[in-house]
Structures are given as C-alpha cells and as structure tokens.
C-alpha cells in the first residue's frame, strides 16, 4: 500500500519559550515581534519525497501565501507512500524558534493528522531521524498551527507523516529562525563536504534508528527474536488498511523467554491519547485486553515452553470477545459493546506504548520470539479458527499477514 503526504503551506517562526508553549494559531506577525526572528523559509530550498503533480509544487509551500486550495495551485502534494516527507534546506545551520504549517482547505483535512516536524543537520531520507519539534494531532480546513521548537538547531526542517501509508499535502510552511553564530560569526555549513556529498550527521541521543525494514515481505518460516529485556527493542507494523475496526481477529505464535510473575506485552496499538488495542500477559499469568479504558481479564491458561498459538476475537455489535490458546477457548466475555477501534495509531511488537510511539518500560517488554501474525477486520468463523490452529491455510489476513508484512525493526531485534 502507498500513502500520500499532502503539504499545504509551511512557515517556520522563531519564538522564545516564554512567548509560545506548544502549538498555537494566530497572528504570526505578532509572533515575529515577540521573538525577533524572521520567516527564513522563502530563502530556503524545498524538496519532497515524491510528487503527485509537478515538481514546482514543493516551492508553493514557502511562497508566503496562506491560500490553501490545492486545486488552484496553492499547495504541494506527495504520492501515497510510506512516511512521506517535505523538507526545507535553510542553506546554513539555524536556531529555530518555531514552525507554522497551514493545512489544506479544499479537501482531506484528516490526512495531516499525526504529522511530525523535525529539525536536524542531515537530509538523509528526508531528515526522518532528526530531532522532533512537534506533532500535529488534528487540524481543521485552512487552519494554521505554530509549534514551539525551543531553539532546536539544524540546517533542515522536515514535515513527515511517520509509520503509515498516506498522502502528504502542505499549503504553507513558515520557519522563524536565527542564524547560528560561533565566536561572533555565522556558523558555516558542515552537513555537506566540498564535493557535495553528505557528511555524517551528528547523532541524536533520543532517536533510535531502524536496523531493518521492508514492505510486503514474506516472512514464512521466519520469526522476530527479541533477545533480552529492553526499553528500546521493538518492531513497528504497518497495516494494509486503516485500523478503524468494528470487529477483528488477531492471531500469532509466541515463544516466551520471561520469568513467572512478570507483565509482558504481546501486542500494542495506540493512537495519540488512547491504548486502542493492548494484549498482555498479566503478572499472575492471566491474559489482559485493554481497549481505550478499563480492560478485561481472561482466566489463566498454561503457556507451553515451546511455540504457543493464540487468537483474540472481538466484535462491536454485541461486544462478544474471546481468547484462544493452542486451540482452546479461555472464555467468552462482553466488552466494549458499540465501540470502535480508531485508526491513525502505531502498532508495535515488543514494547508497550505509554505515550504515542514511546515511553517504554523494559520490565514489561516482550522477550522471546513472535511469528505467523495475522489480523482480519472481522471475526473468523469457528471452523476457520480450528483450521488455523491445525496449521491449515485459511487465506491471508487483510490488515496484517505474515506472508506479506510491512515493518521496521528498531534496536536489537533479529529476523531468524
């Protein structure tokens, strides 16, 4: 699946921490007066990960206009792809006070949800691993939001939609920044060498780089191995379709290497503010399911010291929820009747997300191996579940399927 990244207009403004705390929309000329920095975006060079139309679109984001109709040529637009991005080369290192972005006004306001603004000194992969300035939770049509970057330093400003296939559309980006000075002179650019090749970027202490990733990879007869307790190691899964769910079946095989009396996360799906679908082994060995609030607990079942095959089913209409382990049903419960699992989140194996995509606790991390993960946006019939437990082929999962999985591995995770 491919995603489109749609940029309207982006502007970067510099503000002191005292004058802007977090995101804000309003009078940007007043912001400029507060922090004294000017919008440097129009003097920069824009790039983007792909082009839905002409390459000149990238420049529309820094033309100084807050017009927001893509059909009238006001915005830039990427193809639908995994983590699309738009990047501004400010030509030298700058101290960035704030960045403001303007959303599209004629269509598709929700596409920008979850976008991240990043500042750094590397243009590699669009600066996706640079330091994060802010996250767009939600924007209205034509809305302009400003994000306090707290004087982050770097040459490149990136707007990206991470961890999902999407279009990126921006109508204006404004960057309020001051040139960096070293011993009274402006700092020279060190991100490129004299022959034009990119120099190594300085490491960001709070960023863990992917060690491997793939799109629609066949992992048949392979597994993800999490060798030890960690607050880093995890795998991000990229769904084949939006996870707006009124029913699901989630199945996987796990080989555990954890002591008794330890909480262990099996599957974590979180949107910006909520745990949408978290599956746990509780401290007492029972199974816990948590979907946006209070959870339910299934009776303890004996996990084998070898591979264990588990399945979880849920449907919204009646709230019928079941957990299966190695072909045996633990219990049937009524849970979250009439509710919906919301889309736009991050799916992780190996870690529980206490915040959107982060705040991991190594004492809850998964240790062992996971394989044969499949997920459907429906409850499979009993016959299909029994066939699955017997190792028979029942067709591919339409959200996740082990024979065509899109993912990225972070930290010390091995594909074996």
UniProtKB/Swiss-Prot annotation:
**Any one Gene Ontology molecular-function term assigned to this protein's record:** metal ion binding
Q: Does the keyword Signal apply?
A: yes
Signal peptide residues are 1-14
Q: Which positions does UniProt annotate with glycan attachment? A: 129, 221
Q: Which cofactor does it need?
A: Ca(2+)
Q: What region holds the Pentraxin (PTX) domain?
A: 220-416
Q: Which SUPFAM superfamilies match?
A: Concanavalin A-like lectins/glucanases, Galactose-binding domain-like
- Record has Metal-binding as a keyword: yes
Residues noted as binding Ca(2+) 2 in the record, renumbered to the chain: 354, 364
From the record, give the cysteines joined by S-S bonds. Answer: 251-311
- PROSITE patterns xrefs: PTX_1, PTX_2
| A Pfam family matched in the record | F5_F8_type_C_2
What the entry lists under InterPro entries is as follows:
ConA-like_dom_sf, FTP1, Galactose-bd-like_sf, Pentaxin_CS, Pentraxin-related, Pentraxin_domain
Name used for this protein in its record: Pentraxin fusion protein
